[in-house]
């Protein structure tokens, strides 16, 4: 916050609520405007803790709301097309793993050979965003693809690729981003009857907020399909 507060005091020597709002509105990007407003709010809290008066109005500084744009979700068709475009066993195994597990890029790249349990059918994610290890079920196509890829490999890393390498691979395959595959995995699982509790555990989410977001997206998707079927039946009958 130091940089934003330094800039703020330099440009508004005698700040008030009106001048502060004007200063914030000079920033075109909502994300930056939010951060600046948060810095001012944080200073207000610090001032209150240290019994410094005269800054109570800072708490009224509005924090701009970011627009929640629809996010891309990988579909069955994306999966099928990406598999067709792969040119080697490693790339195919990566696509199968993304579709089967919904792993984050960093988690995918960190997988070691001993993390794959082919008999039980799961992968062990040792390093995750939450810092807690977890197991994620592995589909039969993913197991087969990984087995083929690992044949003859001498390194312990399953894929031997960096997160940026995964990004470039997906671009080369004209496929959705890794996070879109994660969303697609969650929606596909929920669509096929996997419980929200199981999806949350496999994804490594500590709360149900993310699952609720995907459930909402799935509800909208199913509603569209139902309407399309109804219109098709209406047109056929008509």
Language model features with spans:
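C-terminal secondary-structure termini that scaffold catalytic or DNA-interacting sites
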Residues: 229-238
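Conserved tyrosine-mediated DNA breakage-rejoining catalytic core shared by Y-recombinases
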Residues: 101, 110-148, 209, 216
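Active-site/catalytic core of tyrosine-dependent DNA strand-transfer enzymes
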Residues: 139-180
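Basic, Lys/Arg- and aromatic-enriched nucleic-acid-binding interface segment
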Residues: 76-105, 109, 130, 182
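Catalytic-site neighborhood detector that most strongly recognizes the C-terminal catalytic loop/helix
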Residues: 73, 127-130, 203-228
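DNA breakage-rejoining catalytic core of tyrosine-based enzymes
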Residues: 53-55, 65-81, 130-140, 153-159, ...
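Short basic/aromatic active-site micro-motif
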Residues: 174-193
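N-terminal core-binding DNA-recognition domain of tyrosine recombinases/integrases
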Residues: 2-70, 149-153, 172-174
């Amino acid at each position: 916050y130091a940089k934003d507060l330094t800039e703020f005091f330099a440009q508004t020597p005698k700040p008030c609520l009106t001048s502060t709002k004007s200063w914030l509105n000079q920033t075109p990007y909502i994300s930056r405007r939010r951060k600046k407003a948060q810095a001012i709010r944080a200073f207000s809290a610090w001032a209150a803790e240290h019994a410094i008066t005269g800054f109570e109005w800072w708490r009224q500084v509005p924090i701009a709301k970011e627009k929640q744009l629809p996010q891309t979700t990988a579909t069955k068709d994306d999966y099928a097309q990406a598999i067709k475009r792969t040119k080697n066993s490693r790339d195919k195994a990566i696509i199968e793993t993304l579709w089967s597990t919904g792993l984050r890029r960093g988690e995918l790249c960190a997988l070691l050979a001993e993390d794959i349990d082919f008999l039980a059918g799961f992968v062990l994610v040792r390093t995750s965003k939450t810092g807690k290890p977890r197991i994620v079920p592995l589909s039969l196509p993913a197991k087969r693809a990984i087995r083929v890829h690992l044949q003859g490999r001498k390194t312990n890393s399953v894929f031997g690729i960096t997160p940026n390498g995964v990004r470039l691979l997906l671009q080369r395959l004209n496929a959705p981003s890794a996070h879109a595959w994660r969303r697609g995995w969650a929606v596909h699982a929920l669509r096929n009857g996997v419980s929200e509790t199981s999806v949350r555990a496999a994804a490594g989410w500590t709360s149900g907020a993310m699952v609720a977001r995907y459930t909402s997206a799935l509800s909208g998707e199913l509603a569209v399909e139902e309407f399309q079927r109804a219109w098709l039946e209406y047109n056929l009958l008509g």
